[in-house]
C-alpha cells in the first residue's frame, strides 16, 4: 500500500466517525446515530417531571446513547430566541428553558471530553434550502427529506436530528482533502 493510500484511509477513518446528532428540547429530544456516514438509528426520547428532573434524565439518556453506540462525535443544535405568540414572553420563557438544556448538553460534552459541534438552526436548514420558510413548513420539509433520502418516515424531532447529522456529514465531506 502506498503512503498516499494509507494517508487517505487514515483521513477517511477520521471522516466517518460514529456520530450522534441531537435536536434537543426539555421534553422530547430527537436523535440520529450515524455510522460510516449513514443513519443506523433515528429515534427520540421523552422525559417528564419538573425541569431539574428532566435535565438529569436528558443528561443520563445522552450518556447512555454515547456508550451504547460507541459515539466519537456529537452534534447538537444551537438555540435562538424566536418572536412567538404576538410578542408575549412565551418565546423568552421557552428560550430560557432551552438554554438550560443546551447548557447541560454542552457541559456534558466538556466533561466527557467529546468532540462536538454546535450548529445554528439557520445553518443546517440552509444546507437543505428550507431556512426562512416558517417553522411548520421547515419541519414538514425536513421530514420529507429524510423520507426521500433514507426511506424513513419519522417525527419532526427525529427529522431535525437526522438533518443536523446529515449537514455535518456533508460539511465534513466537502472539507475532505483528497490530496
Label each PLM-derived region with a short phrase.
Residues 2-179:
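Phosphate- and other anionic-substrate recognition elements at nucleic-acid/protein interfaces
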Amino acid at each position: 500500500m502506498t503512503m498516499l493510500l494509507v494517508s487517505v484511509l487514515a483521513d477517511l477513518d477520521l471522516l466517518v466517525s460514529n456520530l450522534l446528532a441531537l435536536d434537543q428540547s426539555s421534553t422530547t429530544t430527537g436523535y440520529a446515530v450515524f455510522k460510516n456516514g449513514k443513519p443506523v438509528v433515528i429515534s427520540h426520547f421523552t422525559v417528564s417531571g419538573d425541569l431539574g428532573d428532566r435535565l438529569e434524565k436528558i443528561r443520563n439518556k445522552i450518556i447512555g446513547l454515547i456508550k451504547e453506540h460507541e459515539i466519537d462525535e456529537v452534534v447538537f443544535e444551537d438555540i435562538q430566541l424566536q418572536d412567538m405568540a404576538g410578542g408575549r414572553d412565551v418565546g423568552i420563557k421557552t428560550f430560557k428553558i432551552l438554554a438550560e438544556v443546551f447548557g447541560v448538553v454542552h457541559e456534558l460534552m466538556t466533561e466527557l471530553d467529546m468532540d462536538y459541534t454546535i450548529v445554528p438552526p439557520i445553518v443546517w436548514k440552509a444546507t437543505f434550502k428550507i431556512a426562512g420558510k416558517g417553522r411548520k413548513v421547515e419541519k414538514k420539509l425536513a421530514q420529507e427529506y429524510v423520507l426521500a433520502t433514507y426511506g424513513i418516515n419519522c417525527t419532526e424531532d427525529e427529522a431535525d436530528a437526522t438533518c443536523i447529522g446529515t449537514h455535518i456529514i456533508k460539511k465534513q465531506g466537502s472539507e475532505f482533502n483528497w490530496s
